[in-house]
């Protein structure tokens, strides 16, 4: 019969590999048109050609519970049980993303916990878009890494109940699995290393060359000049410069024009001159009058004699 498992197939998780799919869904697959026409007589080599024709992933859809081609090929692979190397090549295939998804689902169903973490976790770095068909027959966009995350953390994918998977930290404590390093951490390490290299280059650029050190060399045995002497010299030189400056400088014509044109300065100067002349004139007249009226004793005697003669 076409629905029987291969005689040389090994039991998986203590049971027939086809029994990993529920009986109701399995009978629907056997009755489907795609299974009868496309999956009859397929071998491990021919499954690859059918997997390359896949356009979406999904389980069953519609009221009649119709299986998708992706689910039919999954059951066919459980039936013929291809070798592990073929499944690994399915997962490593980067050209056909649905071939990769088919191999990942089969590895999750049949592989050990160590194999699942080893071969499926690298697919977290695949961010390509894929189409998924839900129960209503509608297509939904999702990414490869989302599908892989569901395989490792969900209980049911594509309407298939997944076997129990041992926790990762348990395998790490038992030293059966190394800690996972994400691509983001690797990028951060690269960025940090590049920043450190740039800082080292900047430090090397800041270090002065030996020629520069020779130029800036100073004899430490010679005493330094005190800042007070410098200050005194600067003060002693400043008056000379100030005394020389007015001799050298010539009055600018702009200042003369400004003085001649400004009426306020002219008025103030004329007032100062008048005030000075007034202040000087009373003293001068008083001294003159005092000299004219003040007579010597000889003159006073002569005038007294003349007055007597006139009276006589």
From Swiss-Prot:
UniProt biased composition (Acidic residues): 184-202
Segments of skewed composition (Basic residues): 225-294, 301-312
InterPro entries hit by this protein: PRP38, PRP38_C
Region of interest (Disordered), ranges: 181-312
Compartment list: Nucleus
Entry keywords, A to Z: Coiled coil, mRNA processing, mRNA splicing, Nucleus, Phosphoprotein, Spliceosome
GO cellular component: nucleoplasm; nucleus; U2-type precatalytic spliceosome
Any matching Pfam family: PRP38_assoc
Biased composition (Basic and acidic residues): 203-224
Region (N-terminal protein interaction domain): 1-179
Primary localisation category: nucleus
GO biological process, one term: mRNA splicing, via spliceosome
Segments forming a coiled coil: 170-204
Sites bearing Phosphoserine, chain numbering: 11, 193-194, 209, 226
Source organism superkingdom: Eukaryota
Oligomer status and interactors: Component of the spliceosome B complex. Interacts (via N-terminal interaction domain) with ZMAT2 and MFAP1.
Purpose of the protein: Involved in pre-mRNA splicing as a component of the spliceosome.
Family note: Belongs to the PRP38 family.
Protein name in the entry: Pre-mRNA-splicing factor 38A
Organism: Mus musculus (Mouse)
Gene transcribed to yield this protein: Prpf38a
């Amino acid at each position: 019969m076409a629905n029987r498992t291969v005689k040389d197939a090994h039991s998986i998780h203590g049971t027939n590999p086809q029994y990993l799919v529920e009986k109701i869904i399995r009978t629907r697959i056997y009755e489907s048109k795609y299974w009868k026409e496309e999956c009859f007589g397929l071998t491990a080599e021919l499954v690859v050609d059918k997997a390359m024709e896949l356009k979406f992933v999904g389980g069953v859809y519609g009221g009649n519970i119709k299986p998708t081609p992706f689910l039919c090929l999954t059951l066919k692979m459980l039936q013929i049980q291809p070798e592990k190397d073929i499944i690994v090549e399915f997962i490593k295939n980067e050209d056909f993303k649905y071939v990769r998804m088919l191999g990942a689902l089969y590895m999750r169903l049949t592989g050990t916990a160590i194999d699942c973490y080893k071969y499926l976790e690298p697919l977290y770095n695949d961010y390509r878009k894929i189409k998924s068909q839900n129960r209503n027959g509608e297509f939904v966009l999702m990414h490869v890494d989302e599908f892989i995350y569901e395989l490792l953390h969900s209980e049911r994918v594509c309407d298939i109940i997944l076997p129990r998977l041992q926790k990762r930290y348990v395998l790490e404590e038992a030293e059966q699995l190394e800690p996972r390093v994400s691509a983001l951490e690797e990028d951060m390490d690269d960025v940090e290393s590049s920043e450190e290299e740039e800082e080292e280059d900047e430090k090397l650029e800041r270090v002065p060359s030996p020629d520069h050190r020779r130029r800036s060399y100073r004899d430490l045995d010679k005493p330094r000049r005190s800042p007070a002497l410098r200050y005194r010299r600067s003060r002693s030189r400043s008056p000379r410069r100030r005394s020389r400056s007015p001799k050298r400088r010539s009055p600018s014509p702009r200042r003369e024009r400004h003085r001649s044109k400004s009426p306020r300065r002219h008025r103030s100067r004329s007032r100062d001159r008048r005030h000075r002349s007034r202040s000087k004139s009373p003293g001068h007249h008083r001294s003159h009058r005092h000299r004219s009226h003040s007579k010597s004793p000889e003159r006073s005697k002569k005038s007294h004699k003349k007055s007597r003669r006139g009276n006589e």
